[in-house]
Protein backbone atom coordinates (compact mmCIF):
# COMPACT_ATOMS: atom_id res chain seq x y z
CA UNK A 1 0.00 0.00 0.00
CA UNK A 2 1.27 3.47 -0.95
CA UNK A 3 0.84 5.65 2.12
CA UNK A 4 1.00 9.43 2.12
CA UNK A 5 3.90 9.29 4.61
CA UNK A 6 6.80 6.87 4.86
CA UNK A 7 6.35 6.43 8.62
CA UNK A 8 2.95 4.77 8.08
CA UNK A 9 2.63 1.02 7.63
CA UNK A 10 0.32 -1.93 8.24
CA UNK A 11 1.42 -4.46 10.82
CA UNK A 12 1.10 -8.24 10.62
CA UNK A 13 -2.14 -7.97 12.59
CA UNK A 14 -3.62 -5.63 9.99
CA UNK A 15 -3.45 -2.56 12.23
CA UNK A 16 -2.09 0.78 11.13
CA UNK A 17 1.30 1.63 12.59
CA UNK A 18 2.91 5.06 12.90
CA UNK A 19 6.66 5.04 13.36
CA UNK A 20 6.44 1.34 14.20
CA UNK A 21 3.82 1.88 16.93
CA UNK A 22 0.47 0.09 16.63
CA UNK A 23 -2.25 2.75 16.74
CA UNK A 24 -4.76 0.36 18.34
CA UNK A 25 -2.32 -0.19 21.20
CA UNK A 26 -1.80 3.56 21.52
CA UNK A 27 -5.56 4.10 21.60
CA UNK A 28 -5.99 1.53 24.35
CA UNK A 29 -3.23 3.11 26.42
CA UNK A 30 -3.96 6.81 25.90
CA UNK A 31 -7.57 6.96 24.71
CA UNK A 32 -9.07 8.71 21.73
CA UNK A 33 -9.18 11.09 20.01
CA UNK A 34 -5.40 11.41 19.88
CA UNK A 35 -2.80 13.26 17.87
CA UNK A 36 0.03 10.86 16.99
CA UNK A 37 3.37 12.07 15.65
CA UNK A 38 6.55 10.24 14.74
CA UNK A 39 9.45 11.95 16.50
CA UNK A 40 12.04 10.26 14.29
CA UNK A 41 10.30 11.57 11.16
CA UNK A 42 10.09 15.11 12.54
CA UNK A 43 13.77 15.11 13.48
CA UNK A 44 14.78 13.72 10.08
CA UNK A 45 12.78 16.46 8.34
CA UNK A 46 14.70 19.06 10.36
CA UNK A 47 17.98 17.44 9.39
CA UNK A 48 17.09 17.42 5.69
CA UNK A 49 16.55 21.18 5.84
CA UNK A 50 19.70 21.82 7.84
CA UNK A 51 21.85 19.63 5.58
CA UNK A 52 20.53 21.53 2.56
CA UNK A 53 21.29 24.85 4.24
CA UNK A 54 24.82 23.66 4.92
CA UNK A 55 25.33 22.35 1.37
CA UNK A 56 23.87 25.24 -0.60
CA UNK A 57 24.55 28.19 1.71
CA UNK A 58 27.63 27.05 3.58
CA UNK A 59 25.58 27.06 6.78
CA UNK A 60 25.01 30.80 6.45
CA UNK A 61 21.34 30.75 7.31
CA UNK A 62 18.72 29.39 9.65
CA UNK A 63 15.70 27.15 9.10
CA UNK A 64 12.58 28.16 11.04
CA UNK A 65 9.94 25.79 12.36
CA UNK A 66 6.43 27.24 11.97
CA UNK A 67 4.74 27.15 15.36
CA UNK A 68 1.29 27.11 13.73
CA UNK A 69 1.94 23.43 12.96
CA UNK A 70 2.07 22.57 16.68
CA UNK A 71 3.04 24.74 19.61
CA UNK A 72 4.01 22.76 22.71
CA UNK A 73 7.06 22.53 24.94
CA UNK A 74 8.18 19.11 23.72
CA UNK A 75 8.22 20.24 20.09
CA UNK A 76 10.17 23.37 21.00
CA UNK A 77 12.73 21.29 22.89
CA UNK A 78 13.11 19.09 19.82
CA UNK A 79 13.62 22.16 17.64
CA UNK A 80 16.29 23.42 20.03
CA UNK A 81 18.09 20.06 19.92
CA UNK A 82 17.93 20.02 16.10
CA UNK A 83 19.46 23.52 15.90
CA UNK A 84 16.36 25.02 14.34
CA UNK A 85 14.92 28.50 14.69
CA UNK A 86 11.20 29.01 15.18
CA UNK A 87 8.61 31.54 14.19
CA UNK A 88 5.80 32.51 16.53
CA UNK A 89 2.72 34.62 15.87
CA UNK A 90 1.39 35.29 19.36
CA UNK A 91 2.36 35.94 22.93
CA UNK A 92 1.11 32.46 23.79
CA UNK A 93 3.44 30.74 21.35
CA UNK A 94 6.33 32.95 22.46
CA UNK A 95 5.62 32.18 26.13
CA UNK A 96 5.48 28.43 25.47
CA UNK A 97 8.77 28.47 23.56
CA UNK A 98 10.54 30.47 26.26
CA UNK A 99 9.16 28.18 28.99
CA UNK A 100 10.55 25.23 27.04
CA UNK A 101 14.00 26.82 27.23
CA UNK A 102 14.15 27.73 23.56
CA UNK A 103 16.83 30.40 22.88
CA UNK A 104 15.14 33.78 22.47
CA UNK A 105 17.67 34.91 19.88
CA UNK A 106 16.43 32.15 17.52
CA UNK A 107 12.79 33.25 17.74
CA UNK A 108 11.19 35.26 14.92
CA UNK A 109 8.00 37.04 15.97
CA UNK A 110 5.52 37.23 13.08
CA UNK A 111 1.86 38.25 12.95
CA UNK A 112 -0.23 41.07 11.53
CA UNK A 113 -2.03 42.20 14.69
CA UNK A 114 0.55 42.22 17.48
CA UNK A 115 -0.54 43.95 20.69
CA UNK A 116 1.65 46.34 22.67
CA UNK A 117 1.90 43.73 25.42
CA UNK A 118 3.17 41.13 22.96
CA UNK A 119 5.73 43.55 21.53
CA UNK A 120 6.89 44.40 25.06
CA UNK A 121 7.23 40.71 25.83
CA UNK A 122 9.39 40.22 22.76
CA UNK A 123 11.60 43.19 23.69
CA UNK A 124 11.91 42.17 27.34
CA UNK A 125 13.00 38.64 26.44
CA UNK A 126 15.40 39.57 23.66
CA UNK A 127 13.55 37.85 20.83
CA UNK A 128 15.88 37.67 17.83
CA UNK A 129 13.73 39.27 15.14
CA UNK A 130 10.39 41.06 15.04
CA UNK A 131 8.77 40.82 11.61
CA UNK A 132 6.87 44.08 11.10
CA UNK A 133 3.64 43.85 9.13
CA UNK A 134 2.38 47.43 8.78
CA UNK A 135 3.01 51.11 9.55
CA UNK A 136 0.90 51.08 12.71
CA UNK A 137 2.99 48.26 14.16
CA UNK A 138 6.20 49.98 13.09
CA UNK A 139 5.32 53.16 14.96
CA UNK A 140 4.20 51.23 18.05
CA UNK A 141 7.39 49.18 18.11
CA UNK A 142 9.61 52.24 17.74
CA UNK A 143 7.77 53.98 20.60
CA UNK A 144 7.90 50.95 22.91
CA UNK A 145 11.57 50.30 22.14
CA UNK A 146 12.40 53.89 23.05
CA UNK A 147 10.42 53.72 26.29
CA UNK A 148 12.21 50.50 27.27
CA UNK A 149 15.67 51.62 26.18
CA UNK A 150 15.90 48.82 23.61
CA UNK A 151 16.85 48.58 19.95
CA UNK A 152 14.72 46.09 18.03
CA UNK A 153 16.12 44.09 15.11
CA UNK A 154 13.33 43.97 12.55
CA UNK A 155 12.33 42.46 9.24
CA UNK A 156 9.45 43.62 7.06
CA UNK A 157 6.86 41.30 5.60
CA UNK A 158 6.62 42.09 1.89
CA UNK A 159 3.85 41.17 -0.56
CA UNK A 160 5.86 40.29 -3.68
CA UNK A 161 2.86 39.83 -5.98
CA UNK A 162 3.51 36.15 -6.71
CA UNK A 163 0.94 33.60 -7.91
CA UNK A 164 1.91 30.45 -6.04
CA UNK A 165 -0.54 28.24 -8.00
CA UNK A 166 -2.20 26.96 -4.86
CA UNK A 167 -5.71 27.17 -3.39
CA UNK A 168 -7.05 30.70 -2.94
CA UNK A 169 -7.61 30.06 0.78
CA UNK A 170 -3.88 29.51 1.37
CA UNK A 171 -2.33 32.06 -1.02
CA UNK A 172 -0.52 34.84 0.85
CA UNK A 173 1.91 36.47 -1.58
CA UNK A 174 -0.53 38.25 -3.89
CA UNK A 175 -0.86 42.06 -3.98
CA UNK A 176 -4.22 42.12 -2.18
CA UNK A 177 -3.14 39.82 0.67
CA UNK A 178 -4.03 41.10 4.14
CA UNK A 179 -0.48 40.31 5.29
CA UNK A 180 2.44 42.70 4.86
CA UNK A 181 3.26 45.72 2.71
CA UNK A 182 3.09 45.76 -1.07
CA UNK A 183 6.12 45.77 -3.32
CA UNK A 184 4.20 46.82 -6.43
CA UNK A 185 2.83 50.18 -5.24
CA UNK A 186 5.91 51.45 -3.40
CA UNK A 187 4.49 50.80 0.08
CA UNK A 188 7.37 48.48 1.00
CA UNK A 189 10.00 50.97 -0.13
CA UNK A 190 8.38 53.82 1.80
CA UNK A 191 8.02 51.93 5.08
CA UNK A 192 11.65 50.79 5.01
CA UNK A 193 12.81 54.36 4.37
CA UNK A 194 10.68 55.45 7.33
CA UNK A 195 12.13 52.74 9.59
CA UNK A 196 15.69 53.56 8.56
CA UNK A 197 15.25 56.99 10.17
CA UNK A 198 13.87 55.62 13.47
CA UNK A 199 16.37 55.65 16.34
CA UNK A 200 15.10 52.59 18.17
CA UNK A 201 14.90 50.16 15.26
CA UNK A 202 17.52 48.28 13.26
CA UNK A 203 16.30 47.20 9.82
CA UNK A 204 17.95 43.81 9.36
CA UNK A 205 15.99 42.17 6.57
CA UNK A 206 12.89 41.50 4.52
CA UNK A 207 10.51 38.57 4.49
CA UNK A 208 7.86 37.21 2.16
CA UNK A 209 5.45 34.29 2.33
CA UNK A 210 3.77 33.17 -0.88
CA UNK A 211 1.33 30.52 0.36
CA UNK A 212 1.08 26.90 1.42
CA UNK A 213 0.93 23.47 -0.22
CA UNK A 214 3.10 24.55 -3.18
CA UNK A 215 4.30 21.78 -5.50
CA UNK A 216 6.44 23.85 -7.88
CA UNK A 217 9.90 25.40 -7.62
CA UNK A 218 9.16 28.35 -9.90
CA UNK A 219 7.09 30.47 -7.46
CA UNK A 220 9.90 30.33 -4.89
CA UNK A 221 12.52 31.19 -7.52
CA UNK A 222 10.43 34.11 -8.76
CA UNK A 223 9.85 35.38 -5.22
CA UNK A 224 13.58 35.21 -4.50
CA UNK A 225 14.37 37.11 -7.71
CA UNK A 226 11.88 39.88 -6.93
CA UNK A 227 13.09 40.22 -3.36
CA UNK A 228 16.76 40.30 -4.37
CA UNK A 229 16.00 43.00 -6.94
CA UNK A 230 14.20 44.99 -4.24
CA UNK A 231 17.17 44.63 -1.87
CA UNK A 232 19.54 45.86 -4.60
CA UNK A 233 17.27 48.83 -5.33
CA UNK A 234 17.25 49.88 -1.67
CA UNK A 235 21.04 49.88 -1.66
CA UNK A 236 21.33 51.77 -4.95
CA UNK A 237 18.69 54.41 -4.20
CA UNK A 238 19.04 55.01 -0.46
CA UNK A 239 22.23 53.22 0.65
CA UNK A 240 20.08 50.97 2.88
CA UNK A 241 21.79 47.59 3.36
CA UNK A 242 19.51 44.59 3.86
CA UNK A 243 21.45 41.71 5.41
CA UNK A 244 18.75 39.02 5.66
CA UNK A 245 16.24 37.58 3.21
CA UNK A 246 13.63 35.39 4.87
CA UNK A 247 11.78 33.35 2.24
CA UNK A 248 8.53 31.78 3.35
CA UNK A 249 5.95 29.47 1.88
CA UNK A 250 4.69 25.98 2.56
CA UNK A 251 6.29 23.21 0.54
CA UNK A 252 3.73 20.74 -0.78
CA UNK A 253 3.21 17.53 1.17
CA UNK A 254 1.33 14.38 0.20
CA UNK A 255 -2.19 14.82 1.54
CA UNK A 256 -3.65 12.49 -1.11
CA UNK A 257 -2.31 9.71 -3.35
CA UNK A 258 -2.41 12.11 -6.31
CA UNK A 259 -0.06 14.64 -4.70
CA UNK A 260 3.56 14.57 -5.89
CA UNK A 261 5.73 16.58 -3.48
CA UNK A 262 9.24 17.71 -4.35
CA UNK A 263 12.08 16.79 -1.99
CA UNK A 264 12.49 19.57 0.57
CA UNK A 265 16.13 20.17 -0.22
CA UNK A 266 15.31 20.84 -3.89
CA UNK A 267 13.51 24.05 -2.92
CA UNK A 268 16.54 25.32 -1.03
CA UNK A 269 18.84 24.32 -3.90
CA UNK A 270 16.67 26.16 -6.45
CA UNK A 271 16.52 29.37 -4.44
CA UNK A 272 20.26 29.31 -3.74
CA UNK A 273 20.94 29.65 -7.48
CA UNK A 274 19.06 32.96 -7.54
Regions found by a protein language model. Give the residues of each.
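C-terminal active-site-proximal or functional interface alpha/beta core segments in diverse enzymes
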Residues: 212-274
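Glycine-rich tight-turn/loop motif centered on a GG-T
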Residues: 31-35, 124-129, 168-182, 216-221, ...
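A charged N-terminal "starter" segment
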Residues: 1-153, 189, 193, 197-198, ...
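Conserved radical SAM core fold
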Residues: 71-75, 93-95, 116-118, 160-176, ...
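Non-membrane alpha-helical structural segments and their capping/turn regions in soluble enzymes
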Residues: 39, 43, 116, 135, ...
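Active-site/ligand-binding-proximal alpha/beta "capping" segment
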Residues: 158, 163-204, 208, 217-229
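A short small-residue
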Residues: 22-30, 205-211, 248-254
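Short beta-strand segments
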Residues: 66, 153-159, 207-209, 246-248
Amino acid sequence: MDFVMSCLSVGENGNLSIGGCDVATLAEEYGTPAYIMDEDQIRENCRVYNRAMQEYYGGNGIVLYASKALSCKYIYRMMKEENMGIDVVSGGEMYTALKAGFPAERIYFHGNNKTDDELKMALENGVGRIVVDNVFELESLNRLSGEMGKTADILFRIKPGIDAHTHSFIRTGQIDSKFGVSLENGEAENIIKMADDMENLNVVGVHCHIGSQIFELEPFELAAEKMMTFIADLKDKYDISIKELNLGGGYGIKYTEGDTPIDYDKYIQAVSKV
